[in-house]
């Protein structure tokens, strides 16, 4: 029987790329996963396991894997990019000449372009041109839980409604809900900022500051998301949904969160280099904290938690000093109307 479903190429054989490739393959979409590490790709293609990033979890036998990018995207109806933010631009530059006209590109990468601070949709539009359908996949989702088939909900945002729905349809299933929207800026902002804020919560947990401190930091962190969203063209309801609040809660409370684990290690007194080495995977917040503050400073928005995280990750202050700075801030109204008064101070 001929499979009439779209062929999907997933780029990035880390934990998240593998999880998403396995997800759509289980939904009977012909799927091929591309990655650079020959050993990882061979383990996926032959043994149906990603021994490095998702050990001991069996992947669908229908999922194919390759290190040949041209072979991966050949005949693909659309492409899903799931590489770290530092590799996003380079991956799209390699992808662009291989794409057929009309082939859409979605990405599950969270963060900004390192160095420039550009949103990833801006990078994608510049490289892929004005006609390529684009979408971003984001929301509270640990790769391991998705691969194990545990219930998950994400959101897909894009300006092209048909392509956005196509991506969501491929992912949506009995244990995986995919919602849709068209606020690309808000979706990307939430996915980037939550990583920075998770470091602060991790630090507080590592310092054993208690559950009250955790709740306060999460709530005021959401306030920072909303504040920045109001001046860069994002919609506040996006940040109150899966792309913002949902992802923030998961990343700040889940032990699988690399960014929270980094903060926890720093709060326990570990050095930044040792903590990153122990985690063994990319920790997006190290780069993203600079880019978040770049946007805040360009727009005159005060983000004290994000600013403290940046200073800690730059090793300009200790985690203890960072918490003291936050606790010493002047008392003021909570400003529940921050959705409309973006420039009032926290």
Swiss-Prot record:
GO terms for cellular component: cytosol. It is found in: Cytoplasm. GO terms for biological process: carbohydrate metabolic process; glycerol-3-phosphate biosynthetic process; glycerol-3-phosphate catabolic process; glycerophospholipid biosynthetic process. It catalyses: sn-glycerol 3-phosphate + NAD(+) = dihydroxyacetone phosphate + NADH + H(+); sn-glycerol 3-phosphate + NADP(+) = dihydroxyacetone phosphate + NADPH + H(+). Sn-glycerol 3-phosphate binds at residues 110, 139, 141, 194, 247, 257-259. GO terms for molecular function: glycerol-3-phosphate dehydrogenase [NAD(P)+] activity; NAD binding. Belongs to the NAD-dependent glycerol-3-phosphate dehydrogenase family. The active site is at residue 194. NADPH binds at residues 15-16, 36, 110, 143, 258, 282, 284. It comes from the Bacteria. This is Glycerol-3-phosphate dehydrogenase [NAD(P)+]. Keywords: Cytoplasm, Lipid biosynthesis, Lipid metabolism, NAD, NADP, Nucleotide-binding, Oxidoreductase, Phospholipid biosynthesis, Phospholipid metabolism. The keyword Acetylation does not apply. Its EC number is 1.1.1.94. Pathway: Membrane lipid metabolism; glycerophospholipid metabolism. Catalyzes the reduction of the glycolytic intermediate dihydroxyacetone phosphate (DHAP) to sn-glycerol 3-phosphate (G3P), the key precursor for phospholipid synthesis.
């Amino acid at each position: 029987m001929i499979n009439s479903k779209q062929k999907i190429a997933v780029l990035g054989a880390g934990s998240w790329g593998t999880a998403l490739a396995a997800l759509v393959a289980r939904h009977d979409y012909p799927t091929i996963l591309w990655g650079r590490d020959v050993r990882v790709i061979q383990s996926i293609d032959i043994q149906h396991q990603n021994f490095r990033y998702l050990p001991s979890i069996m992947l669908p036998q229908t999922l194919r894997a390759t290190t040949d990018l041209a072979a991966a995207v050949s005949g693909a109806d659309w492409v899903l990019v799931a590489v770290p933010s530092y590799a996003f631009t380079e991956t799209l530059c390699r992808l662009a000449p291989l794409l057929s006209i009309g082939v859409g590109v979605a990405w599950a990468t969270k963060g900004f372009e390192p160095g420039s601070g550009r949103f990833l949709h801006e990078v994608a539009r510049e490289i892929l041109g004005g006609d390529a359908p684009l979408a971003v996949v984001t929301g509270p989702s640990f790769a391991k839980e998705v691969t194990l088939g545990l219930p998950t909900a994400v959101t897909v945002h894009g300006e092209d409604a048909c392509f956005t729905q196509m991506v969501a349809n491929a992912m949506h299933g009995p244990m995986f809900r995919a919602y849709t929207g068209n606020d690309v800026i808000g979706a990307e902002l939430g996915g980037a900022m939550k990583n920075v804020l998770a470091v602060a919560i991790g630090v507080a947990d590592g310092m054993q500051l208690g559950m009250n401190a955790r709740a306060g930091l999460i709530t005021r962190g959401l306030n920072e998301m909303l504040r920045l969203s109001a001046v860069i063209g994002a919609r506040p309801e996006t940040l109150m949904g899966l792309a913002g609040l949902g992802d923030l809660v998961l990343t700040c409370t889940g032990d699988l969160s690399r960014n929270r684990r980094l903060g926890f290690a720093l709060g326990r007194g570990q050095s930044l280099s040792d903590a990153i080495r122990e985690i063994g995977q990319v920790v997006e917040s190290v780069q993203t904290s600079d880019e978040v503050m770049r946007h805040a400073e360009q727009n005159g928005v005060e983000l004290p938690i994000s600013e403290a995280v940046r200073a800690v990750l730059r090793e300009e202050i200790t985690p203890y000093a960072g918490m003291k700075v936050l606790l010493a801030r002047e008392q003021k109204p909570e400003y529940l109307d921050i959705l409309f008064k973006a420039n009032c101070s926290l």
